[in-house]
Amino acid sequence: MDRRELLKNACGLGVCGCALGILGIPEKARAEDTGAVDQRLAFARYQVAKLVGFVAGATTPEACAGILEKTGRECAKLGQLGQFKGNPEGYFAAAKQNWGTDFTWDKEKGTVTIAVAEGPCGCPLVDATRTPALWCNCSVGYQKEAFETIFGRPVQASLKESKLTGAKRCVMEVRLS
């Protein structure tokens, strides 16, 4: 299996926590995932945390962030974002209903602020005690791909707050180009 296949399969299995809500995973199903951790999942979380640390140590922070953003973009491509092309309000409503995500859209400034619900990180591969905050660049890439699909033009995305750095919520900002 090559790297692309691995990433595609991993994202298809729900690796990107941001995608779970958009894909319509009900709250009850997500809540059940917070029970006893399967040893395989615990091992995967450990390995992902180590992998991110190794990549961060072997590259520049910018290169590592870029790799993780690409991972997030691939995850977003596997979702059902196409149904929201030209319909950002529909996307906002679906994410709010399915994931508890809040959106603030300043049409004049061309910015969208995304505030993920409080609580533990939604990514099933995150071990909050081990995973470096660099991992959050995956979510930045997801947001870039999502909003480029929705608005049909390039966007810039940035992470403002992260649960992995101690914030209560993850907050991202998207700027339309």
Where are these regions (language model features)?
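Amphipathic interaction/junction segments at domain boundaries or subunit interfaces
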Residues: V55-W135
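Short Pro/Gly-enriched beta-strand edge/turn motifs at strand-loop
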Residues: K85, R153-Q156
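Short terminal or interdomain "cap/linker" segment that borders an active site or interface and mediates
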Residues: A10, Q156-S177
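Bacterial N-terminal signal peptides
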Residues: C16-G21
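C-terminal segment of N-terminal export signals and the immediately downstream linker at the start
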Residues: I22-A56, C75
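Active-site helix/loop of acyl-thioester processing domains in fatty-acid/polyketide metabolism
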Residues: L134-G152
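A general secondary-structure signal for short beta-strands and their flanking turns/coil
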Residues: K109, G152, A167-R169
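N-terminal secretory signal peptides and thylakoid transit peptides that target proteins
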Residues: M1-V15
